[in-house]
Amino acid sequence: MIAAQLLAYYFTELKDDQVKKIDKYLYAMRLSDETLIDIMTRFRKEMKNGLSRDFNPTATVKMLPTFVRSIPDGSEKGDFIALDLGGSSFRILRVQVNHEKNQNVHMESEVYDTPENIVHGSGSQLFDHVAECLGDFMEKRKIKDKKSPVGFTFSFPCQQSKIDEAVLITWTKRFKASGVEGADVVKLLNKAIKKRGDYDANIVAVVNDTVGTMMTCGYDDQHCEVGLIIGTGTNACYMEELRHIDLVEGDEGRMCINTEWGAFGDDGSLEDIRTEFDREIDRGSLNPGKQLFEKMVSGMYLGELVRLILVKMAKEGLLFEGRITPELLTRGKFNTSDVSAIEKNKEGLHNAKEILTRLGVEPSDDDCVSVQHVCTIVSFRSANLVAATLGAILNRLRDNKGTPRLRTTVGVDGSLYKTHPQYSRRFHKTLRRLVPDSDVRFLLSESGSGKGAAMVTAVAYRLAEQHRQIEETLAHFHLTKDMLLEVKKRMRAEMELGLRKQTHNNAAVKMLPSFVRRTPDGTENGDFLALDLGGTNFRVLLVKIRSGKKRTVEMHNKIYAIPIEIMQGTGEELFDHIVSCISDFLDYMGIKGPRMPLGFTFSFPCKQTSLDAGILITWTKGFKATDCVGNDVATLLRDAIKRREEFDLDVVAVVNDTVGTMMTCAYEEPTCEVGLIVGTGSNACYMEEMKNVEMVEGDQGQMCINMEWGAFGDNGCLDDIRTHYDRLVDEYSLNAGKQRYEKMISGMYLGEIVRNILIDFTKKGFLFRGQISEPLKTRGIFETKFLSQIESDRLALLQVRAILQQLGLNSTCDDSILVKTVCGVVSRRAAQLCGAGMAAVVDKIRENRGLDRLNVTVGVDGTLYKLHPHFSRIMHQTVKELSPKCNVSFLLSEDGSGKGAALITAVGVRLRTEASS
């Protein structure tokens, strides 16, 4: 017993001693964490260079765009062929995907040889061989008569400009077929298939084995966004933000980047860690000076590295008592599979003895221990280096996402990772130390990269079908110039109907006389109160207007909320609330004594019989207060003031917000004769010739007409351009069948149109993984401000995702792109429709005056116009295209329509004074 313990102790001491000797001998191969972190930094820099348009031509890490933009989402289906060429054998698979049965994937495959004479022969020989194997495979399965979609895993560095094209940059591994470098491998394969003429195949996608691995694992885990191969060769790919990929147009979404990291160090950046053995391996390789990182880490070279170390140590008398055999000196006699066998925990030393005996060196126990440790150092260095480069990718992903902690999945394949007994454990452990702020799940690709090629093909098919359906849906929102000219023509016809006495009562566009007969002339003077009611907020203003050489307008205002229960309660409650707010404001300003003139901006359709009387025709914008429609709102206000018995006011003018906006801008710019509001609601007004206003006596001069154009289309004249979504929004609104034009244009409804489209797309599985969340079911969730933010050019997709998350919608990058697209289509149509309406107005003014050209200014207000990044530009462009004989300027109303109400009141007071004197 004691003897056995002594023997074990002696053997352990002996082993430790041998290990220390080897550690010392191979010191250069043992990399500290500090060195590995430095390598991470270097690789991160190389990645950046590869992605940059300026540095890519000279970058060693090529960072090749793959044009794979999306990982599987589980809805893929179909029957696909996959070719997998890149190693010692060539595999063909038939992959049948059925998403209805728990993502069921049925695969059958066959392996074909790629003999040396073919991989080192001509390109046409190689692709003839591939085409022959594919024909044999299809013949056996009786599918030669089908034009099957084919995914091609081609595991060599390729330049791609689309997913079904791949120009070989350089052969790697043992391949050297002539005439292929610089050529499109898809064309070469298609040519070989065509030459045979006995079957047809549609090559939909070419992918690298790394991309194939990511896609294979991505089918099982949708968080998989990195692919890693550690086998005969090594490489990695990951999903990069498109905005960082200079070589590809566009900045929306993500694309898989094939790093081709095997070439890391080809520019000399790893010389400080390369050893004499690495240099010797490189000198004896098929591609000296290339793939230097791969030659330090991949399965093709590890066995050879160990052999070179053993030869040198034997020559120096440190192993095998200096014995060197012809076998030990022969390249390829010591393989990576031998390294794996020797590093096994229990039988490793026994395996070492067997393998070394096969090489004829008659090893001692010491030799076996030493050789085992040499293998450990070489394979451990490989694991450490791969951990460093993968760590750089993970840090980049984390920074791209802007999250303090990354959670992701890495799909892995390759014989070294799979079969080496210690490799994966060491690799994971090092990675955790290097990137402690990343939680990484490693998912082994059980089916190789061939299934991934089929998945890329399936995704390409799914995306093409989705794209077709999305385009089909959104096409209904695209308006041609002819369609817009027709809208302009119809608006003009409706305007005429509203102006004529005979047709006015039945007209949809009411063309209401405002009794505002002129714009300010600069002589207005005095202090005026203004009320502004038109949305969920209500403003009370004190406006001090001073005339003279230096005209000034000084304003003080306070905003009050109108609760929903008052908006939809009784008329008395609404006007009592308004008077209560006025009372508070008069106290706040200390002006409750004198009877002041007041202008009331009342932004709802009213029939006016004079400047100070407006009979409400209908409520819009969510208001539903009872006992108001059909009554004079000025009288309702006066009655409420009387009920309060605190103060008195002189209600001089009832004006629409659009008229107020026109007057505000006309005070600054005399050519302003049109007012436009595009905010919660939408409306326009303009100065019409009195002779055309049949509803008011007299035909001298002009009068501002409040068009109430929101009701355009209420008679069905826009039904041919209204979509299914417009009808849905209308149906569920408070005023179904009314304000149809407004519901296609204004901020109150655009978000609802978007929401309904998103629900439809989610039901079809195009968005949010097909899950309709509670927030998405909530009406009114998409406010104008969110649409404006989402469509901002300055906003990266991450910020779009953040906005959607704020709304309770968890989106992927692809989801964010589609949401942004939908918002853009809906808001573009709104701007074009608004422009068509405005074109009708300015052309009418021009024709009224018999002018060949008209110069006119439009005063504009409203949140959609002000805040949306593209609305105003598209609207201006539309007006320009549809009314080429009008030079139209747009002036933003900075002070809102309240100031306009005060100016109208001032004009009214001036005219009243003039009349009485």
From Swiss-Prot:
<dbReference type="InterPro" id="IPR001312">
    <property type="entry name" value="Hexokinase"/>
</dbReference>
<feature type="region of interest" description="Hexokinase small subdomain 2">
    <location>
        <begin position="521"/>
        <end position="655"/>
    </location>
</feature>
<comment type="pathway">
    <text>Carbohydrate metabolism; hexose metabolism.</text>
</comment>
<protein>
    <recommendedName>
        <fullName>Hexokinase-1</fullName>
        <ecNumber>2.7.1.1</ecNumber>
    </recommendedName>
</protein>
<feature type="binding site">
    <location>
        <position position="345"/>
    </location>
    <ligand>
        <name>ATP 1</name>
    </ligand>
</feature>
<feature type="binding site">
    <location>
        <position position="897"/>
    </location>
    <ligand>
        <name>D-glucose 6-phosphate 2</name>
    </ligand>
</feature>
<dbReference type="InterPro" id="IPR043129">
    <property type="entry name" value="ATPase_NBD"/>
</dbReference>
<dbReference type="GO" id="GO:0019158">
    <property type="term" value="F:mannokinase activity"/>
</dbReference>
<dbReference type="GO" id="GO:0051156">
    <property type="term" value="P:glucose 6-phosphate metabolic process"/>
</dbReference>
<dbReference type="GO" id="GO:0004340">
    <property type="term" value="F:glucokinase activity"/>
</dbReference>
<keyword id="KW-0399">Innate immunity</keyword>
<dbReference type="GO" id="GO:0001678">
    <property type="term" value="P:intracellular glucose homeostasis"/>
</dbReference>
<feature type="binding site">
    <location>
        <position position="30"/>
    </location>
    <ligand>
        <name>ATP 1</name>
    </ligand>
</feature>
<feature type="binding site">
    <location>
        <begin position="532"/>
        <end position="536"/>
    </location>
    <ligand>
        <name>D-glucose 6-phosphate 2</name>
    </ligand>
</feature>
<feature type="binding site">
    <location>
        <begin position="84"/>
        <end position="91"/>
    </location>
    <ligand>
        <name>D-glucose 6-phosphate 1</name>
    </ligand>
</feature>
<dbReference type="GO" id="GO:0008865">
    <property type="term" value="F:fructokinase activity"/>
</dbReference>
<feature type="binding site">
    <location>
        <position position="742"/>
    </location>
    <ligand>
        <name>D-glucose 2</name>
    </ligand>
</feature>
<keyword id="KW-0472">Membrane</keyword>
<feature type="modified residue" description="Phosphoserine">
    <location>
        <position position="337"/>
    </location>
</feature>
<comment type="subunit">
    <text>Monomer. Interacts with RABL2/RABL2A; binds preferentially to GTP-bound RABL2. Interacts with VDAC1. The HK1-VDAC1 complex interacts with ATF2. Interacts (via N-terminal spermatogenic cell-specific region) with PFKM (via C-terminus). Interacts with SMAD5.</text>
</comment>
<keyword id="KW-0963">Cytoplasm</keyword>
<keyword id="KW-0021">Allosteric enzyme</keyword>
<comment type="function">
    <text>Catalyzes the phosphorylation of various hexoses, such as D-glucose, D-glucosamine, D-fructose, D-mannose and 2-deoxy-D-glucose, to hexose 6-phosphate (D-glucose 6-phosphate, D-glucosamine 6-phosphate, D-fructose 6-phosphate, D-mannose 6-phosphate and 2-deoxy-D-glucose 6-phosphate, respectively). Does not phosphorylate N-acetyl-D-glucosamine. Mediates the initial step of glycolysis by catalyzing phosphorylation of D-glucose to D-glucose 6-phosphate. Involved in innate immunity and inflammation by acting as a pattern recognition receptor for bacterial peptidoglycan.</text>
</comment>
<feature type="binding site">
    <location>
        <position position="232"/>
    </location>
    <ligand>
        <name>D-glucose 6-phosphate 1</name>
    </ligand>
</feature>
<dbReference type="Pfam" id="PF03727">
    <property type="entry name" value="Hexokinase_2"/>
</dbReference>
<dbReference type="GO" id="GO:0005741">
    <property type="term" value="C:mitochondrial outer membrane"/>
</dbReference>
<feature type="binding site">
    <location>
        <begin position="747"/>
        <end position="748"/>
    </location>
    <ligand>
        <name>ATP 2</name>
    </ligand>
</feature>
<keyword id="KW-0496">Mitochondrion</keyword>
<feature type="domain" description="Hexokinase 2">
    <location>
        <begin position="464"/>
        <end position="906"/>
    </location>
</feature>
<keyword id="KW-0067">ATP-binding</keyword>
<feature type="binding site">
    <location>
        <begin position="84"/>
        <end position="89"/>
    </location>
    <ligand>
        <name>ATP 1</name>
    </ligand>
</feature>
<dbReference type="GO" id="GO:0005536">
    <property type="term" value="F:D-glucose binding"/>
</dbReference>
<keyword id="KW-0547">Nucleotide-binding</keyword>
<feature type="binding site">
    <location>
        <begin position="682"/>
        <end position="683"/>
    </location>
    <ligand>
        <name>D-glucose 2</name>
    </ligand>
</feature>
<feature type="binding site">
    <location>
        <begin position="532"/>
        <end position="537"/>
    </location>
    <ligand>
        <name>ATP 2</name>
    </ligand>
</feature>
<feature type="binding site">
    <location>
        <position position="680"/>
    </location>
    <ligand>
        <name>D-glucose 6-phosphate 2</name>
    </ligand>
</feature>
<feature type="region of interest" description="Hexokinase small subdomain 1">
    <location>
        <begin position="73"/>
        <end position="207"/>
    </location>
</feature>
<dbReference type="InterPro" id="IPR022673">
    <property type="entry name" value="Hexokinase_C"/>
</dbReference>
<keyword id="KW-0418">Kinase</keyword>
<dbReference type="GO" id="GO:0006002">
    <property type="term" value="P:fructose 6-phosphate metabolic process"/>
</dbReference>
<keyword id="KW-0007">Acetylation</keyword>
<feature type="domain" description="Hexokinase 1">
    <location>
        <begin position="16"/>
        <end position="458"/>
    </location>
</feature>
